[in-house]
Amino acid sequence: MIISGKELSVKLKDEMKAQVATFPDKYGRVPHLVVILVGEDPGSVSYVTGKAKASEYVGIKNTTIRKPDSISEAELLTLIDQLNADDSVDGILVQLPLPKHISEDKVIAAIAKEKDVDGFHPLNVAALWQKQDCVLPCTPKGIIKMLKVAGVEIKGKRAVVIGRSNIVGLPVSKLLLDENATVTIAHSRTVDLPSVTRNAEILVVAIGRPKFVTADMVAEGAVVIDVGVNRDPETGKLCGDVDYAAIEPKASVITPVPGGVGPMTITCLMENTIECFLRKQSIA
């Protein structure tokens, strides 16, 4: 079974579109997402464009603020402070990566917790690990949604996550734990990685290396979630972290690249923006 994140995201966006259409009558306005883009990295520009298109489709107001990569850290932090204080702004996202002279940790921590639509703020991360109500990181949230829609039973399953980043690896491991999977986190220093991955009933791969996971590393009937977005060094085409053509016949469930996890990440960003907006309305 192939899980199409593209198809699922369209369904979810249609539901959100209907929900947002009721907001002007209920609350006097629609949610407002501000995206800050520093520099002209082609990948970042593409992601920001995708977020703007999704916002427009759902009916969320989207403002993209473009800054040159020469902007100072202090100037960027001042801009974030201004957006934090702006009551018309519900969500703030700073597109990563940032230029080397700017601390990503400082920038993430500067965003108001209640406007952190990425779920990266230290207080949101702490709340996730404490099982408290919080904004969930978009990609891990999307992965769990895809597993559930595909009818995958997570409880009691052996799940292996390759990758330990704060953006995907660690939070998706926690969400799988919360669904009562038995989770192993593997990484670049894991000894005999194939023996670890072959034990996985659910395998999540998020390392950013094209076709790194080969068919002999995957058990027959495994569920394979490919988070990677890379260029195939041979063809130049987009590919994931797993060798899709070789693994798809073995897997019971698999996500393609493109059209798998990627669309769900942007869709969950829309969900998080609505969530931040509604929380503000409930407090007001």
Regions found by a protein language model. Give the residues of each.
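Positively charged, low-complexity intrinsically disordered leader regions
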Residues: 1-28
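Short beta-strand segments enriched in small/hydrophobic residues
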Residues: 31-39
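Glycine-rich phosphate/diphosphate-binding loop of Rossmann-like nucleotide-binding domains
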Residues: 38-52, 134-223, 227, 232, ...
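Short beta-strand elements in bilobed, periplasmic/extracellular small-molecule ligand-binding domains
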Residues: 55-69, 183-185
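Short, well-structured alpha-helical segments in soluble
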Residues: 75-87
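Anion-binding alpha/beta catalytic cores of soluble intermediary-metabolism enzymes, centered on
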Residues: 94-154
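Short glycine-rich anion-binding loops that position phosphate/pyrophosphate groups of nucleotides
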Residues: 95-101, 209-211, 230-232, 260-263
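Rossmann-fold NAD(P)-binding glycine/threonine-rich loop
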Residues: 105-121, 125, 228-281
